[in-house]
Amino acid sequence: MNEKLGYGKYHIEEEGLCGRTTIFEDPLRDNRNGSHMLPALLETHQHADLIIVMLGTNDCKAAYGASAEMIGKGIEKIVGQIRGGAPDSKILLISPIWLGEKVWKPGYDPEFSEKSVAVSKHLAKVYRQIAEKENIAFLNAAAYAKPSAADQEHMDPENHRLLAEAIYQKVIEIEGILE
């Protein structure tokens, strides 16, 4: 993304963390609750023009038992925190790709269930409603990318490329950048 936007003109700070959730505590992995980490991140990266949020896949884990609507409540909390900590920043909310149909089966990720797949497919609708209510930009990642056949959860390089291009186009639209 830095390369496409032009080094020097734009600076991208990536804060992805494997296992991060919106509001849930992972009893086996510390510091995965996004709402607890966000205030420090906002302070670290003050004066961001645009903050992109793509969370929710890990919230679909069976241990949390969360519905898409409950995950949406976590997203609403995150958006509120951004509004409070970075009031001048624009926000792009991205609903994550769907989990693959077999992600919960033996040989894949036992932290997910069949219900997890269904919940992941409902996130875009919930997130779109939040984006409309909050008057923020929205992108449905599942419209552009899908999980790899290898693990049914993460994107392969081609799907990363497809999603990156969609995000790039959305950033251009939001920021009014002329190519």
Where are these regions (language model features)?
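Structural motif
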Residues: 22-33
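A short beta-strand-loop structural module common to alpha/beta enzyme folds
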Residues: 8-23
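A short, Lys/Arg-enriched amphipathic alpha-helix followed by its capping loop at the start of a domain
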Residues: 1-8
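Alpha-helical cap/lid subdomain in secreted, periplasmic
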Residues: 32-179
